Every structure is written in C-alpha cells, then in structure tokens.
Swiss-Prot record:
Keywords: 4Fe-4S, Amino-acid biosynthesis, Branched-chain amino acid biosynthesis, Iron, Iron-sulfur, Leucine biosynthesis, Lyase, Metal-binding. Belongs to the aconitase/IPM isomerase family. LeuC type 1 subfamily. Transmembrane segments: none annotated. It catalyses: (2R,3S)-3-isopropylmalate = (2S)-2-isopropylmalate. Pfam families: Aconitase. One of its GO terms (biological process) is L-leucine biosynthetic process. Its cofactor is [4Fe-4S] cluster. GO terms for molecular function: 3-isopropylmalate dehydratase activity; 4 iron, 4 sulfur cluster binding; metal ion binding. Pathway: Amino-acid biosynthesis; L-leucine biosynthesis; L-leucine from 3-methyl-2-oxobutanoate: step 2/4. [4Fe-4S] cluster binds at residues 347, 407, 410. The gene is leuC. This is 3-isopropylmalate dehydratase large subunit. It comes from Shigella dysenteriae serotype 1 (strain Sd197).
Length: 466
C-alpha cells in the first residue's frame, strides 16, 4: 500500500499498538528548555525514576534569558529559578545542557539542527509548540505538554494518535526577494489559522525544493500557525549536505548508510492525502499580517481590508476585533502604517541566512528616527558566524541593537517587549494580542521586510528598495 511520508515516519516508530487503543511511539530526540521542564523533572524525582535515555535528551536555555547580559539574575526571580532548576536537573539526571556560558546555547529549534541533533527520519519532541521546525529535515517533530515531557524522560515513548494528512504544493518558482516567510504566510492566508487542524502537513512543489534548509525550517516552524500538528519536507540532497559533518550527525560509512535510508523517506507515488492545497509561487508577494492571527495577512502593497468584505460572519467579527486592537482603519495602504519597534529573531527567522538578508537592506542606511530595532541571533554559533562576516557591524552602524541569543521579543518572557500601543514589525511567528507585551501590536514579516520597516519607519516593499 502506498504511504505518505508522515505515515512512514509514524509506522516505523510504533512500539506497541493494541486494538482500539492509542499507539505508543518511540521518541528519538527530546529537546528540553527551562520553562516546560521543571515540573517534569520533579515528577521523576518524586517517583524515584531516572531519565531512561539521557543521551537522547538535549537541553538549552532560551525562553526567558536576557539578550543583554549572561547574568542569570537579569530577567527576574521566576526566570532565575527556572534556569537554576534546569542546571540542577540536567546535572542530577545526566542530561547535556547548553547553559548561558556554553558556546552552543541558543533557541532550542536553532540549536538542534545546527548541532546535528535533528536528523531525517526521527521522531523529535519538545515542550514547545514550534517543535514542528525540525520537520524541515523529514523528521516527525511536534510540541508536547509538561506531563508528556515527564513521560518521555521516563520512558522514551509517547502515546500518539494518527493525524490526518495534508499536502500543500507550491508550484513554480518564487520571484526574487520572496522568502520562505512570505510563502508560509501566503499559505496560512489561504488555509486560515485553523485550516490544518488535526493534520500533519507535507510541503512540496518546486518552490519548496528550491528553499535552503533554513528556509524549510521557517516553513515548518509555522505549520502550527495553521493549526497543524506538524509540518514536513521530504529530505533530499539539500538536507544531506546541511547535515553532513555536524557534531551529532553520523560519520563516514554510517553517514552513507544513513543517506541510503533517508532517501526512502518520500511519499510514495499513488499515496492519498486527506486534504490538498495548491498555490502558485509566482503569485506570492512580500507578506505582512494586519490582524491578530497569522491568517490575517495581505501583500505589502494592499490596503487594510474592510471587515464588511468578509462573507463569513465569524471572520467579519474577528476582523473587526483585530482592527480595533491593532488601531488600524480599513482602506489604509499598508505602506502608510508607521512602526515603533522592529524585532529580527525567533526560532522562525534568526539563522545566518535571515541575518544576511536583513543586513543587505540595513547596509549603508540608518534606522528611522524614533524606531528601536533589535537583532537577536538564534544561537551562539549564529552570532559568531554573523560577527565573522561583519554583519554585526552593519547592524550597529545602521542603528540596530546587536543582542545575545535567546527567544527575546517573540514572546516577551524576558525584558524585551512592547509597551501598550507600540507597533512592531517582527520576524517571529505569532501576532496574537499581547504576545510581545501587553497591548503590543505585532505585524509578522520576513527579515528583509523587517529591516526595510526599520530604515523607513513604516512598512515598505523590499522590491522598491535599491
């Protein structure tokens, strides 16, 4: 029987499946951070259980770390306690930890791939909703809750029901300057923020194959923003070339054997999907969200939509509420909307290619008066590479703030946040009410678009910036 990539990944990891019961899956990699793990480790301690396979668990600090200092006390008592607990727990249970002073420290979904912890064909979990990022490698990766974190630590398994399957095909080639962020925002604009609910999405088509691994990570990172359980891109030569030589990747003959297996991780011809969505890449322009969910998105050259234009009464009501929160009026050109802050970072867009794209726009320009612009690399290695390439100097000379790695303003758990009423062009993944700070107004964009907003003071089409 012909199988989809998701079905192959799921079936090869079933440890046990009783009739009419939820299958038990083996978990190859477990990524841990300071926010969703303390209670899980406490649960192990209370029952006298060890971590079953500590060599398959990797920890880092990211969610509430300061991006201005490596001082563990910088972001308040709760952050300090969570980080101290992670240090204690990793030491006690034998888990590898990339702490604030480790050169590999960074956002968990940046650290995993760059260290070769993430590999094709794996099951990967983390107590974080954007674990879908790792699906870019042809791995089944999804976020879990704290009680499930404890279950994986204790057993290296997890009960998981089968999801429905969705194919999203982006046909043709994207225009110059159109990034993975624009593609995924256009997809979510078409499906809506709940269009993928109950599904695992496989992204395919020429425009997807053309993406680098970093672009594919951006794409899969936001699968969750259309309601999907996970996102997948089938592994190919781009994948294998990225993985080769990384710290935890197989070496020598083991790598060759792995590639031979990884090449089988494709959807079979004739396999059927429950849902199919198709987009034309050449029709996608630079995208900007205008509302309070990622599906409320338009082209940078469009006007703010009129809620009255929505046929669905639920969508109409959501649009009215979103415009009121965002302080926007229907019919205004998006390019006339001024911004207060810019955030370039997050597990969506903080890798070296993202920083290069932003620096290309920033070079030789200045941040507009009254705008605060932050650039937060996704990890220590990304920061080091950017500095080796001189990107930090480009940003600093343009008036951007060059920060230490962490999740930062994506979710405002540290000191990087919006004040009430402030408007931000952000490369992150969520524009919910209050996501970047109480009363803050978030517009999701690509790194180049964020840099363009920083230097012009408003949203601008990067295709017009020479």
């Amino acid at each position: 029987m012909a199988k989809t990539l998701y079905e192959k990944l799921f079936d090869t990891h079933v440890v046990y499946e009783a009739e009419n019961e939820t299958p038990l899956l083996y978990i190859d990699r477990h990524l841990v951070h300071e926010v969703t793990s303390p209670q899980a480790f406490d649960g192990l301690r209370a029952h006298g259980r060890p971590v079953r396979q500590p060599g398959k668990t990797f920890a880092t600090m990211d969610h509430n770390v300061s991006t201005q200092t490596k001082d563990i006390n910088a972001c308040g008592e709760m952050a300090r306690i969570q980080m101290q607990e992670l240090i204690k727990n990793c030491k006690e249970f034998g888990v590898e930890l990339y702490d604030l002073n480790h050169p590999y420290q960074g956002i968990v979904h940046v650290m995993g791939p760059e260290q070769g912890v993430t590999l094709p064909g794996m099951t990967i979990v983390c107590g974080d909703s954007h674990t879908a990022t790792h699906g870019a490698f042809g791995a089944l990766a999804f976020g879990i809750g704290t009680s499930e974190v404890e279950h994986v630590l204790a057993t290296q398994t997890l009960k998981q029901g089968r999801a429905k399957t969705m194919k999203i095909e982006v046909q043709g080639k994207a225009a110059p300057g159109i990034t993975a962020k624009d593609i995924v925002l256009a997809i979510i604009g078409k499906t809506g923020s709940a269009g993928g609910t109950g599904h695992v999405v496989e992204f395919c088509g020429e425009a997807i194959r053309d993406l680098s691994m970093e672009g594919r990570m951006t794409l899969c990172n936001m699968a969750i923003e259309m309601g999907a359980k996970a996102g997948l891109v089938a592994p190919d030569e781009t994948t294998f070339n990225y993985v080769k030589g990384r710290l935890h990747a197989p070496k020598g003959k083991d790598f060759d054997d792995a590639v031979a297996y990884w090449k089988t991780l494709q959807t079979d011809e004739g396999a059927t999907f429950d849902t199919v969505v198709t987009l034309q890449a050449e029709e996608i322009s630079p995208q900007v969200t205008w509302g309070t969910n990622p599906g409320q998105v338009i082209s940078v050259n469009d006007n703010i939509p009129d809620p009255a234009s929505f046929a669905d009464p639920v969508e109409r009501a959501l649009a009215e509420k979103a415009l009121a929160y965002m302080g926007l009026k229907p019919g205004i050109p998006l390019t006339e909307v001024a911004i207060d802050k810019v955030f370039i970072g997050s597990c969506t867009n903080s890798r070296i290619e993202d920083l290069r794209a932003a620096a290309e726009i920033a070079k030789g320009r200045k941040v507009a008066p009254g705008v605060q612009a932050l650039v937060v690399p996704g990890s220590g290695p990304v920061k080091a590479q950017a500095e080796a390439e001189g990107l930090d100097k480009i940003f600093i000379e343009a008036g951007f703030e060059w920060r230490l790695p962490g999740c930062s303003m994506c979710l405002a758990m540290n000191n990087d946040r919006l004040n009430p009423g402030e408007r931000c062009a952000s490369t992150s993944n969520r524009n919910f009410e209050g996501r970047q700070g109480r009363g803050g107004r978030t517009h999701l964009v690509s790194p180049a678009m964020a840099a363009a907003a920083a230097v012009t003071g408003h949203f601008a089409d990067i295709r017009n910036i020479k």
